């Protein structure tokens, strides 16, 4: 059970925004979805990519001192042979994604007696060690996320994380007052403000419905609906992280699809599409605009990673189980960004 405190010395007092926030923020949305299988994925929103690829990491690829771990697949920027994951899922079905949390994320120095993990290795260490959400909770019970950089000139990204499998979903936020682990009953995460505030804000929208509204304004007035969709009037439509959280939660909660793989994957991308960004709508600097660089969907039960990019709206898939998961070398698939158009004549 998640307890939300909304007064006194609480999460509101911990929420801050850096002076250069407009320059530092980039926006993302992560969701879960379940039909016959469990699905997990996200939009990554930014103004430019960093050469990210879909990466399969086999069990015997060396992560520092760890020579053996669960195999995993995800989106990463591979630097000096090391996959810096944006999001990933392991062979057991546990998934994780890092989302921007500027102004609130805080990583300190190593603490004796704690499980010290650098921010850049958080996803890899977690998914390499934990088979499910219960093991992830135990893994996080004594964790200290440090500001140790991957290399000189590459500072730690300010993130928080959504972690999930078919049995549950949690959010991890490392702030100045410690590491917080929250249950996530809606299976959605965006960026700022901190997760408890995002979740509490759903109370303002409890009257929204996919059904047509009834006239409760006045029995003396002959008020009638004049359009479909009026039950959701008031649902935020802007691109701010708070509004995307509310919109994604509403769409996910009311989303219906068939149980087949194609129907499930298609619906998953439609849910993410409700909060995707189009070039020109979110200016971050003169002439520079944030867009949804890619959207991804993991079938966590089958080990398949699906994605589409801003320029390529077709769905591309990588199946981790078609690779040698007992190998020692990562397998990298650069994202296909070229627009693909199917002509019927």
Language-model-detected regions and their locations in the chain:
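Short, Lys/Arg-enriched N-terminal segments with co-localized hydrophobic residues
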Residues: 4-26
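C-terminus-biased signal that marks the final domain/tail of proteins
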Residues: 23-33, 39, 148-151, 156-157, ...
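A contiguous strand-loop segment
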Residues: 25-115, 142, 147, 332-336, ...
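Beta-strand residues in well-ordered beta-sheet regions across diverse protein folds
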Residues: 41, 98, 173, 306-308
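Short, surface-exposed beta-strand-loop junctions and turns on beta-sheet-rich folds
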Residues: 46-48, 102-104, 177-180, 187, ...
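Proteins synthesized as precursors that undergo proteolytic processing into mature forms
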Residues: 113-149, 261-270
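Active-site periphery "cap/insert" segments of enzyme catalytic domains
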Residues: 134-174
């Amino acid at each position: 059970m998640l307890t939300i405190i909304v007064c006194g010395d609480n999460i509101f007092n911990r929420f801050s925004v850096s002076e250069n926030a407009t320059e530092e923020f980039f926006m993302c949305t992560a969701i879960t979805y379940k039909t016959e299988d469990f699905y997990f994925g996200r939009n990554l929103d930014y103004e430019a990519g960093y050469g990210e690829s879909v990466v399969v990491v086999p069990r015997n690829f060396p992560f520092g001192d760890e020579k053996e771990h669960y195999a995993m697949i995800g989106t990463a920027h591979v630097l000096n042979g090391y996959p810096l994951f944006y999001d990933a899922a392991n062979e057991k079905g546990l998934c994780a994604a890092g989302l921007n949390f500027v102004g609130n994320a805080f990583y300190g120095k190593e603490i004796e007696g704690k499980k010290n993990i650098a921010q850049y290795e958080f996803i890899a260490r977690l998914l390499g060690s934990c088979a499910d959400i219960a093991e992830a909770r135990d893994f996080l019970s004594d964790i200290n996320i440090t500001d140790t950089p991957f290399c000189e000139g590459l500072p730690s990204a300010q993130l928080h994380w959504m972690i999930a499998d078919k049995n549950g979903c949690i959010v991890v936020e490392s702030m100045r007052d410690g590491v917080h682990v929250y249950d996530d009953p809606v299976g959605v995460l965006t960026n700022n403000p901190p997760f408890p505030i995002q979740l509490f804000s759903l109370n303002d929208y409890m009257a929204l419905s996919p059904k047509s509204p009834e006239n409760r304004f006045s029995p003396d007035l002959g008020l009638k609906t004049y359009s479909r969709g009026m039950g959701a009037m008031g649902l935020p439509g802007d691109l701010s992280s708070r509004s995307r959280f509310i919109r994604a939660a509403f769409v996910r909660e009311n989303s219906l699809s068939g149980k087949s793989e194609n129907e499930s994957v298609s619906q998953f991308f439609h849910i993410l599409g409700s909060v995707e960004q189009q070039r020109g709508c979110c200016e971050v600097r003169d002439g520079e605009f944030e867009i949804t660089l890619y959207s991804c969907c993991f079938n966590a039960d089958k080990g398949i990673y699906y994605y589409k990019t801003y320029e390529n709206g077709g769905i591309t898939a990588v199946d981790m189980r078609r690779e040698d998961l007992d190998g020692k070398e990562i397998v990298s698939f650069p994202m296909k960004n070229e627009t693909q158009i199917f002509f019927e004549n």
